[in-house]
Amino acid sequence: MPKVGMEPVRRKALVDAALRVIGDQGTLAVTMSEIARTAGVSPALAHHYFGSKEQLLIATIRSLLGKLRDDAVAAMKAAATPRERVSALIRVSFRADQFAPETVAAWLAFYSEAQRSEEVRRLLVIYARRLRSNLLVGLRALCPADDAERIAEGAAAMIDGLYIRQSLKSAPISIEASVALTEDYVNAHLRANGDGKYPSPRV
């Protein structure tokens, strides 16, 4: 029987282990035994807490999304202006912890799994909608609504695309370069729509 009060600790250890194993192997075709061994617990205990590998994988992607959401909320609260809010979201999307090799590999594996799993697809759609919505809050204060929608879609696509580039080990792009490219895109479109009225904050 698991020790009383240890469930949150063990569940987190299993989620962290799942992220490492998925990242190391670059696929979701991992076993509960491999994850349990990495977490330092028995497969039986892993099944006790999560029921199945699928449930553990869903908990793992929820953990990634939850961390990203919390970081975004904190960054937006610290922003003083709408333009700073947009920049804060861009920077959060390219934080160093999001660029860890195992995290990049896990995200790519989850995107692949979304072609088969309705729940994984649903969670990734929530992420995409949240990113777009958060960008729009800042952009709507800077340009007309239609333009804000278009800029938000483009910026979100750049964020996802530049992130995927990290999987190309032979052609990496730095965090700062990723931020700068996305900022350049936003700046160019804001200038086109606002005649340079909304300068970018220093990044």
Curated annotation (Swiss-Prot):
The keyword Transferase does not apply. GO terms for molecular function: DNA-binding transcription factor activity; transcription cis-regulatory region binding. The keyword Iron does not apply. GO terms for biological process: glycine betaine biosynthetic process from choline; negative regulation of DNA-templated transcription. It comes from the Bacteria. Residues 31-50 bind DNA. Pathway: Amine and polyamine biosynthesis; betaine biosynthesis via choline pathway [regulation]. Keywords: DNA-binding, Repressor, Transcription, Transcription regulation. Repressor involved in the biosynthesis of the osmoprotectant glycine betaine. It represses transcription of the choline transporter BetT and the genes of BetAB involved in the synthesis of glycine betaine. This is HTH-type transcriptional regulator BetI. It comes from Rhizobium meliloti (strain 1021). The lineage of its organism: Bacteria, Pseudomonadati, Pseudomonadota, Alphaproteobacteria, Hyphomicrobiales. The gene is betI.
